[in-house]
UniProtKB/Swiss-Prot annotation:
GO terms for cellular component: cytosol. It catalyses: carbamoyl phosphate + L-aspartate = N-carbamoyl-L-aspartate + phosphate + H(+). GO terms for biological process: 'de novo' pyrimidine nucleobase biosynthetic process; 'de novo' UMP biosynthetic process; amino acid metabolic process. Pathway: Pyrimidine metabolism; UMP biosynthesis via de novo pathway; (S)-dihydroorotate from bicarbonate: step 2/3. Heterododecamer (2C3:3R2) of six catalytic PyrB chains organized as two trimers (C3), and six regulatory PyrI chains organized as three dimers (R2). L-aspartate binds at K93, R176, R230. The gene is pyrB. It is an enzyme of class 2 (transferase). It comes from the Bacteria. This is Aspartate carbamoyltransferase catalytic subunit. The keyword Transferase applies. Its EC number is 2.1.3.2.
Amino acid sequence: MIQDNFFPLFPHKHLLAIKDLSVQDLNTLLDRAEANVILSNKIDKTKSILRGRTQINLFFEASTRTQSSFELAGKRLGADVISVAIGNSSVKKGETLFDTAATLNAMKPDILVFRHSSAGAAALLAQKVDCCVINAGDGAHEHPTQALLDALTIKRAKGRIEGLTVAICGDILHSRVARSNILSLNALGARVRAVAPSTLLPTEINHMSVEVFNTMKDGLKDADVIMMLRLQHERMTGSFIPSTREYFHYFGLHKENLTYAKNNCIILHPGPINRGVEIASDIADGPQSMIRTQVEMGIAVRMAVMEALLDSRLKINGEKK
């Protein structure tokens, strides 16, 4: 296995957004994650870099995949992991986010994994605490670890990212996953497409370095990678589609639409899946689907992020392990 000392220094205290990272930063995290994938195939999947360290998961939005992935990543690195149940917390009694942050900061954690429905909340929190903050999703803004695990999934399946055509399809307007992936994939040399009805595209889409398509036939033509996104009804305040049935016919991924892409294309989805809305069950469970692989890569990536942040903190501040 590659030793931590062989990786370039990750020059950040927090991981808040893909837009903050250079190409070298992205590749450093992906290389670290590759080493963790190798580790995950061994009987002993653990490391000790976070032994004696505390990781707090603070999720203001419901999560199964992401929170469980961070919990397992921290435990595999030897951390003491605490997940705060917001439903039973002081937040429900009227405590503000910043008061909660001050309380947690007084406990002197080393890593705070944070998810919130408001864009920019993670960056604000990072200003109020002394520990490393990892953004696990802030509103429709960014979800950096999802973009990293998607990049790792693509790289391992295709052997590269540069030069590939990646079609991101669905509710791009409300998707933090889309925004982070557009940034990371462009930086890593992919050709990125946004495929959606005009009602589900952000107004700034023409300034996001993507090709825009309003039909699956045109958007999926010769695609190497298809990334499907769910309709985020919880962020919608009006009617964006006529019906889910019509949406699936025109913008869902089913056998007919899949024929427009390359025969060896791979299919990604960040989850949760709405079968029969944005993707057919036989496609989600088919041989081209990388959905389960994404879950596996998520643990490796989140381990890599925590390793890199702590390694940076130790070297920059001269702290002892």
